[in-house]
Amino acid sequence: MAKQSSRELALERRKALSNSGKKSTTLNGSSPNRIRTASDARLTRTDQSFVKAGKESVQLTAPKREQLDTSFVASRESSGASRRQVKTIRNSSRELVLARRDELSRRGQPAAKSKDRTRAEVEKISSKVSQQDAAKKQVNDLASDQKGVDESSSKSLKSLDTVSRLSSRNSTSRPSAKRRSIQNPSRALVLARREAQSKHGKTAANQPTSAASVARQGDPDLSSREISQRVRELRSKSGATGKKRSGACRPCGPNRNGSKQAVAADAHWKVGLSETSTGQVVTGTQANRSSKTTGNEASTCRSITGTQYLGSEVFDTFCQSAPQPGQPLKVAVTNTSHGNRVTGNEVGRSEKVTGDEPGTCKTLTGTEYISANQANQYCGVSQPSPRKVGQSVTEDGRKVSGVMVGRSEKVTGDEAGSNRQLTGDQYLGVDPLPEGRSAEKVGSFNTLRGAGVTGTNVARSEYVTGNEPGSCKRVTGDEYVGPQQYNTFCGGKPNPEAAKVGLSLTNKSQTVSGTLTGRSELVTGDEPGTCKAVTGTPYSGVEQASGWCDTNSVREIQDRTPKLLGTPGAVMTGLQPGVGGVMTGAEKGACEPLTGTPYVGGDQLVQACGSDAPAGSNDHQGSSESSPWTHFSVQSPARAMQLQRDPRSGVTGTSYEQGSQITGPFNMAVDKITGTEQFRFDRKQRHFKSVPVEATPNDVSQTRPESRVTGEGQSAGLNITGDDWDRSERVTGTEGASARRRNPTRPGPMSAMPAADLKRNEEVSQPMSRVTGSSGNTDQGSLITVSGGARG
């Protein structure tokens, strides 16, 4: 029993704390007045002998260990002796905690072997663990210095063996069913729930509340047979009260009251709901003034500071008007420009605060924390800021939120494909595209000569300052500014410069681009050979011949240029693998145009196909004798002699001027008489007229007009009278050669020196530069110029 009261112990403890602090020996050690009795003491691992044995087990010698191996009785005696010797326990929990911390500091987390335990597990383990196992663990840790107690240890060993056998038998045998007294089912259910919560905590509340689960929660060691017995016992007493039903039970008895049955009055709510004067909802126990309660009339209609807990219905019922708030709201509710609600301290502009006027109506980026009501009050219009997270709807009606990647008026380069239907995941909403077109990233305009130019527009603009100088001046070199600049800022566009790269059309209707090598008005010395036909690759266009030559020269140049046509070709002689003959099977594809070397003549193709002949089949048929390719371009001596011999027809004797009119023997007829002329290699077939030639009468009176000139001056058989030199009905005179001799005339003015002939070269002004062939030259600078560019 304790010899000191609790007050004396407290005073002693405080005195020790004031003298030596928390390290006082009176605090760590147990006082003699707090000694446990022998009945309270039991063998634990925090026993002093148990701790000392752990330290002395390291100092065991080899002979002592052999004695422990050969004689197991000595170890049992030590356990019995330790149980007899009851000593004082000095703060065993503190020593256990210190030992555990020491092990954790040395070995770390593996030294922590403690686990979470419940009361059910502790009881289950304590019933199964035998005293024999506890004695074996103590033998391995105790020292061998207790040799004088062999007899007592042997007796204790026998008693321990008997106890262990009994405990092992009891553990192996199945526990018999315990008889329980009849209890109230609801009380048993509550007790089982509390017991389960004490063992398993909050997890026990989530378990089902069936009869079997309740029985298992009360005693987890029950077998399935015992649980079924408990369930049957409960159902035999209470029926199906604990069983869940799918629907409500229908009344089975007669309704005696009928329609006169009164509706049960609703009970008073434990948790009330009211609304403050500022529109906030307050829930909880209602502390409002009530007509059924006396003593709460004071200060009902006064304004108070702090949290408002009275509902607005109190002021409407007992007061004439609502109270005026004396201080700003502690938590304000405002709306952003996009309609989102923001709660907290209101940091906007206020009429009672000065110095916060700058930046009131400016749009800020980032999180919007200023109310839209402020913009309406001080600025007049609320300008919504750009959304950080946009919302849209797809074509199927699904909502899409996030960064909007659609087309915008403030972004360039996203115009391509904006109106196309794409496959895959839809990331654009059904919102209409913005009106108007943004600034073009790649501009398109025309030069002064009409050529198209694409790229970044570097011309003068109304939105850019500093680019006014030189906007209306003419610049040589590559033209990169369109006529829009001259029409907008200069009033008109200048004449285009000489083309650096010209375009021309050859005789074969092919386009040639590059530096033009034809005749030019600005170049002298290139007149010879302008209108001559040149064979080979044409490098001059038809426009050169049309501008400087007559029609005959242009036609000759066009005829001289061969046209490389495919099928059909020119008229061919010899064996032709053509179509339209006696061979069958050649009709397929005969009238289709082919490329390559022509092996079918145009005459044969026209004869076989008719109107289905390809285009250009008659081009070779129109060649005449005057065409350039029908004559030799070089006159050899033999060719010259042949041309002289043909018109003279030096061979006589067989054909005459009118051979068909000659009569005589048959062998002198045409093509029947052989001779030198018919054996010539280059003879030409003569065509004789077989029809008689009609003689034309020479009637002068019908062809010559009637003359009215009479007199002696008549020289042509007519008599001319009068003095008139012109033929008239009333004038007569001389006419003829005599009249011309009598009246000589001059065709024009005569001078001693002949008149100078006007030539074209005198009309052309003298060029400033001695180098010709390019444009943009001056009389200063280098004499060598780059075609199409500035002098350098």
From Swiss-Prot:
Cellular compartment(s): Carboxysome
Biased composition (Polar residues): 17-36, 69-82, 161-175, 618-636, 651-662, 764-785
UniProt region (N-terminal domain), positions on chain: 1-235
Processing after translation: Has been suggested to undergo ribosomal frameshifting, as does its ortholog in H.neapolitanus. The exact position of the putative frameshift is not given, but it would probably occur in the sixth M-repeat and remove the C-terminus.
M-repeat repeat extents: 270-319, 330-379, 388-427, 441-490, 500-549, 560-609
Region (C-terminal domain): 616-792
GO MF assignments: structural constituent of carboxysome shell
C-repeat repeat ranges, renumbered to this chain: 633-678, 703-738
Annotated spans, Disordered: 1-259, 280-299, 338-359, 608-662, 687-792
This protein's GO CC annotations: carboxysome
Region (Middle region): 240-615
Keywords: Bacterial microcompartment, Carbon dioxide fixation, Carboxysome, Repeat
UniProt N-repeat repeat ranges: 7-22, 94-109, 187-202, 225-240
InterPro entries reported in the protein's UniProt record: CSOS2/2B
Disulfide bridge map: none
Alphabetical GO biological process terms: carbon fixation
Pfam families reported in the protein's UniProt record: CsoS2_M
Region described as C-terminal peptide (CTP): 763-792
Domain of life: Bacteria
Compositionally skewed regions (Basic and acidic residues) per UniProt: 1-15, 97-106, 113-126, 218-236
Function as written in the Swiss-Prot or TrEMBL entry: Required for alpha-carboxysome (Cb) assembly, mediates interaction between RuBisCO and the Cb shell. The protein is probably intrinsically disordered. The C-terminal repeats act as the encapsulation signal to target proteins to the Cb; they are necessary and sufficient to target both CsoS2 and foreign proteins to the Cb. The N-terminal repeats of this protein bind simultaneously to both subunits of RuBisCO.
Quaternary structure, from the entry: Probably interacts with the carboxysome major shell protein CsoS1 via the N-terminal domain; this complex probably also interacts with RuBisCO.
Family: Belongs to the CsoS2 family.
Domain notes: Has 3 domains; the N-terminal domain has 4 short repeats, the central region has 6 longer repeats. The C-terminal domain has 2 repeats and a highly conserved C-terminal peptide. The C-repeats serve as the encapsulation signal for the alpha-carboxysome, and are able to target foreign proteins to this organelle.
Protein name: Carboxysome assembly protein CsoS2
Originating species: Prochlorococcus marinus (strain MIT 9313)
Designated gene of the protein: csoS2
